[in-house]
């Protein structure tokens, strides 16, 4: 492992249903990620600007999935907790946002900062589940969404990132449904269209490699993008940054991975290059 990474305080824990990031914010343009983002300042404050004209300053913001926004920080680094929408009840986001916008917001901001310190100290210890991370950050696990087994299987196919590209037709066939019926079921269950879901998961998969010295054109193909131009446009849309800027700002980022979402989670695997 690179000494610079080993000594860095920047870290990212990637889980199937959560991401905990504490590191450089960069200078992002407008972004539109496909998951709920809870931003917390490490020092100073944050500024959130939304596509509908909203402009607010504070130490904590919760932004729902697929909402265009720009986030900036007084300090170079910030914390971001990412929650995948298909993993929690449909009303969980609104309930959490309500809590965070009220008197509890400051308490939760403190919890998330404490979670950062705790995760930093636990680098070489046992793994952590989504429920445990939720409790560290929000005081309790977020209510889980119950999904149709056919949708669960299709999600597992989408996030495998190996072999032939996953299509709605292939998932529908595996589920024993027509393509139109499957697409309806998928959106009904997850609240997201199949196409948007697949695009977000593909962009999210990039995070696993963010601190590595890779040929980006080859990485784009490996992840499933048809070409480098499509790759760059997609990443900029979701993250507000070009792929090269993400990799440049992640050189000293220690990346950890917890492979399962529930109880019995495996220990972290460090991917620090």
State the predicted function of each range.
Residues 4-98:
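N-terminal regulatory/effector-sensing and dimerization cores
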């Amino acid at each position: 492992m690179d000494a610079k990474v080993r000594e860095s305080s920047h870290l990212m824990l990637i889980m199937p249903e959560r991401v905990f990031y504490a590191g450089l914010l960069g200078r992002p343009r407008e972004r539109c990620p496909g998951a709920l983002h809870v931003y917390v300042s490490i020092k100073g404050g944050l500024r959130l600007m939304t596509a509908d004209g909203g402009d607010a300053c504070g130490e904590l913001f919760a932004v729902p999935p697929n909402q265009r926004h720009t986030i900036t920080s007084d300090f170079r680094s910030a914390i971001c907790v990412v929650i995948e929408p298909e993993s929690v009840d449909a009303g969980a986001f609104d309930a959490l946002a309500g809590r965070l916008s009220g008197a509890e917001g400051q308490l939760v901001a403190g919890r998330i900062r404490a979670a950062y310190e705790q995760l930093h100290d636990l680098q070489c210890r046992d793994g952590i589940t989504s429920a445990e991370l939720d409790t560290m950050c929000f005081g309790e696990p977020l209510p889980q969404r119950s999904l149709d087994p056919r949708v669960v299987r299709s999600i597992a196919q989408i996030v495998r990132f190996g072999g032939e590209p996953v299509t709605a037709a292939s998932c529908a066939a595996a589920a024993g449904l027509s393509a139109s019926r499957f697409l309806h079921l998928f959106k009904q269950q997850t609240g997201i269209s199949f196409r948007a879901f697949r695009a977000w998961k593909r962009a999210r998969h990039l995070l696993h490699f963010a601190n590595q010295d890779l040929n980006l054109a080859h990485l784009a193909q490996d992840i499933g993008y048809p070409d480098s131009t499509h790759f760059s446009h997609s990443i900029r849309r979701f993250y507000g940054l070009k792929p090269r800027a993400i990799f440049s700002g992640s050189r000293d980022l220690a990346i950890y991975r917890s492979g399962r979402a529930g109880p019995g989670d495996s220990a972290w695997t460090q991917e620090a290059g």
